[in-house]
């Protein structure tokens, strides 16, 4: 009985598992899974958190620095040793005349005194920087800039993943559309085989015509097999992209989203340039180079601060004593001015390089936007041409079918008309898929990644 229940449980898992795996996924769901499970997204989040920790650490430089320490020593010999020999000491008897020639003496025993043979010292320091050449302020600005740059890089990673996921989604969707088109073509050939077979039985056509149709049907079976293999690979690639177990039976839902005409999406390239994350990162690079130059300049300026120290000291057999010290400090790096001036000039040149990179990259970004627009426009034109070609192919097939049934057209012309229609539908599917991808690329190029899905 237990074994029977075990087999029943395994059978239930076998039935339920594929049903769950084949749950249709929409584009929004696919993108959501990719953003949740992609390793690059997780790493970009960690980088943002690390940059925030650096900013928090930099903010602590505004507060006093506190340090504590202690020292214990026990020497085999004291640092200072004082020996006093014994002897007779004159005693004053009250008569001034006897000062030079004492008549009474007292014995003084000799002795030894040791200092710093053993000791305990503990201290607590508090130092508040008053002026550090602007390095604390600029260091905090640089850390905040690094945090913002990490956020921009995270957004770029997110946009790239959305784009790559959308491309794979539309690639799989186009293969499913082609599979449906090929299935319709195969059904059309099957119907034609039956009609040609009936005509052959009636002696209206030659057997060669039936062989031609069957040969075409075999070609369609081969194409269908190749297409199915490609669809399985595309499905598994999409599963890997969105972080779920590989499943060649993955099913998509929602179909094609609305393809907006390119004119509805157009924006002036200059108006959206600064909304690009790449441009924002380049601007931050210029600001970072400027702050690094200021940081180097601060190293050449005087440093000032105040501090307090409390000490607890116990030396040898003496009592424990507590001392307090307040002090101020001023440091002027005189010897660093010569070499530091050259390093400061190097930082200035780095800043100029960053400015040149910003200008050059801005021009490249504008060119990228223009190229994305041209590709989008060409993609829309291709869709229109494919739709016209399908209408013409459908009309051509209708005419050839009527002529074939009337005995006015050869079978080869009918087969060619059917193949042209199937080819036109495949080209329309490719054009639609490519246009949706180009639409995503144009939205990303114009800084509108939020509209990708």
Regions found by a protein language model. Give the residues of each.
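Bacterial Sec-dependent N-terminal signal peptides
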Residues: 1-27, 35, 453
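Transmembrane beta-barrel architecture of outer-membrane proteins
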Residues: 119-121, 167, 212, 303, ...
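Periplasmic alpha-helical coiled-coil/stalk elements that build and connect Gram-negative outer-membrane
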Residues: 25, 53, 154-273, 372-375, ...
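Amphipathic alpha-helical coiled-coil segments
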Residues: 43-58, 157, 161-180, 198, ...
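Bacterial Sec-pathway N-terminal export signals of envelope proteins
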Residues: 21-79, 130, 204-206, 246-290, ...
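Small/polar (Gly/Ser/Thr/Ala-rich) solvent-exposed segments
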Residues: 42, 65-80, 110-117, 127-156, ...
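Residues on the lipid-exposed face of transmembrane beta-strands in outer-membrane beta-barrel proteins
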Residues: 124-128, 238, 328-332, 431
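Acidic, low-complexity, intrinsically disordered peripheral segments
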Residues: 67, 76-80, 84-90, 427-453
């Amino acid at each position: 009985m237990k074994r029977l229940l075990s087999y029943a449980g395994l059978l239930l898992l076998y039935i339920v598992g594929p049903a769950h795996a084949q749950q249709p996924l929409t584009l929004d769901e696919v993108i959501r899974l990719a953003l949740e499970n992609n390793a690059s997204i997780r790493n970009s989040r960690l980088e943002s958190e690390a940059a925030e920790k650096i900013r928090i650490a930099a903010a602590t430089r505004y507060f006093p620095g506190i340090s504590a320490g202690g020292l214990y020593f026990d020497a085999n010999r004291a640092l200072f040793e004082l020996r006093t020999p014994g002897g007779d000491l004159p005693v004053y008897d009250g008569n001034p005349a006897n000062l030079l020639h004492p008549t009474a003496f007292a014995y003084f025993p000799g002795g030894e005194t040791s200092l710093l043979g053993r000791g305990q010292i503990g201290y607590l320091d508090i130092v508040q920087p008053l002026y550090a050449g602007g390095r604390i302020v600029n260091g905090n600005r640089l850390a905040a800039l690094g945090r913002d740059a990490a956020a921009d890089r995270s957004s770029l990673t997110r946009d790239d993943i959305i784009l790559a996921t959308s491309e794979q989604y539309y690639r799989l969707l186009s293969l499913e559309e082609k599979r449906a088109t090929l299935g319709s073509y195969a059904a059309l050939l099957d119907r034609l085989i039956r009609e040609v077979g009936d005509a052959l039985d009636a002696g209206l056509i030659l057997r060669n015509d039936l062989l031609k149709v069957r040969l075409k049907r075999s070609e369609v079976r081969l194409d269908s097999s190749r297409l199915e293999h490609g669809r399985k690979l595309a499905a598994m690639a999409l599963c890997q992209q969105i972080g779920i177990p590989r499943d060649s039976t993955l099913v998509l839902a929602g179909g094609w989203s609305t393809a907006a005409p390119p004119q509805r999406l157009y924006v002036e390239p200059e108006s959206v340039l600064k909304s690009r994350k790449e441009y924002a990162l380049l601007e931050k690079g210029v600001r970072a180079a400027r702050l690094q130059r200021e940081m180097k300049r601060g190293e050449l300026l005087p440093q000032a601060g105040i501090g307090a120290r409390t000490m607890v000291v116990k030396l040898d057999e003496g009592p424990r004593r507590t001392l307090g010290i307040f002090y101020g400090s001023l440091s002027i790096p005189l010897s660093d001015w010569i070499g530091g001036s050259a390093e400061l000039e190097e930082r200035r040149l780095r800043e100029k390089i960053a400015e040149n990179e910003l200008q050059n990259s801005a021009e490249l970004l504008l060119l990228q936007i223009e190229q994305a627009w041209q590709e989008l426009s060409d993609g829309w034109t291709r869709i229109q041409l494919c739709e016209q070609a399908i209408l013409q192919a459908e009309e051509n097939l209708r005419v050839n079918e009527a002529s074939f049934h009337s005995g006015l057209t050869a079978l080869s012309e009918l087969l060619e008309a059917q193949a042209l229609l199937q080819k036109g539908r495949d080209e329309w599917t490719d054009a639609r898929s490519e246009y949706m991808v180009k639409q995503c690329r144009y939205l990303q190029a114009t800084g509108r990644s939020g509209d990708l899905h």
